[in-house]
Each structure stands twice: as structure tokens, then as C-alpha cells.
Amino acid sequence: ILSRQDVITGLLPASTAINAHGDYTDAWVRDNVYSILSVWGLSLAYKKHAPEHYRAHILKQSVVKLMRGLLIAMMRQSNKVEAYKQSHNPLDALHAKYATDTGLAVVGDDEWGHLQLDATSLFVLMIAQMTASGLSLIYTMDEVDFVQNLVHYISRTYSTPDYGIWERGNKINHGTAEINCSSVGMAKAALEAMSGFNLFANSKSQEGVIHIVAND
């Protein structure tokens, strides 16, 4: 897995394949988070059994590098998060995938089913869980504010049709968004994990605490 990690962005390509069906060398948010979980798990094993081994540090920082690569890619589209909170228009959604080597957008707003709330929720959930495990993922107040905005972004998943884990909308492949239980469940888990969570980990300061409003 780590042999495929981009040395600059920290992102992982979904595949090395470029064929008639498309270019799969892009970095999907969902694929990246799920892929790096194995590295995170191995880093926790080293932390417990061989904390002084160099691999304990390398594995941990490889996870940080990927998660921050995704964070930076999303923060470049922070204007879309603000727009979506007001419009709930799928065209205002954060992109579902980015260029592996730059973290920049690779397809237009209307060229992909970008509104995949399970992927965004998974990212938010793992920020909480990885931070709780001892990783330092969030560095500044700008980043805290953005994660707080992501919480608002996913808060209406229970009533929001999206393209979900299937990416193509409803199951007959017509590209029509629908409410997906996989998205609803992941959003619920993310909101529960983030409620009152301090992104600055062991800091006694309250500035890094994420708030979930009652309606969320």
C-alpha cells in the first residue's frame, strides 16, 4: 500500500489502471481512508509492542500524511461546503476524488456523482478515531473550523439523497440520487464521534472542540 503513496500529497491511487472505462489512478476519498486503515492498525500494533522501532514512526506518519492530504484537498473546496450548506445542490458537493499527485479537482461538478456523504462521513469519523489514538491530524484553527463545517455538511444525511457508496445513484444505474442507509449510518457514527470531541487531543483548551447541534 505505502509503495503507492504519493510522496508529495500522501494520497493513494484507486488503481494503476487506465482503460476504456476510465482513469482509475485518481485518489477517491473513500478508497483512501479505507486503504490507510490497515496502515493505521499496524502502527497501533507497533505502538503497543515495539514503540521504539522506526516502523512505528513511519507507519504513523504515513497515516497522518494521507489524512492531511485529503484535508488539504477538501479545504481547497471550502467554498463548496459553504454553498452546499445553503443550497443542498449536488453540484455544490465536495468532490469525491482528486488528482493523486496534486490533490486538485480532476472532473467537473456535473461530470461525476460527487455527493457521496458516506465518504465524507467516513473521513470525519476517522479524524476523530485516529486523533483519539494519538495521531496529530489537525494543526490550526482554520482546520478546526473546516472540520466543524464538515459536521454541518453531513448533518442532514438522513434526509438527503446522495450517490452513496455505489457512486451512481439508484441501483438501476440511472444516476438518480437516493437516500442510502450506508450514508445515513456512517454520518450517524461520525456525528456521535465528533460530539464534544477536541481535535487538539490532550489540550485543555476548548477551541478545538467540535459541536453538534441538537437537530444534527
Locations of the language-model features?
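Acidic, mature catalytic/reactive cores of soluble proteins
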Residues: 1-216
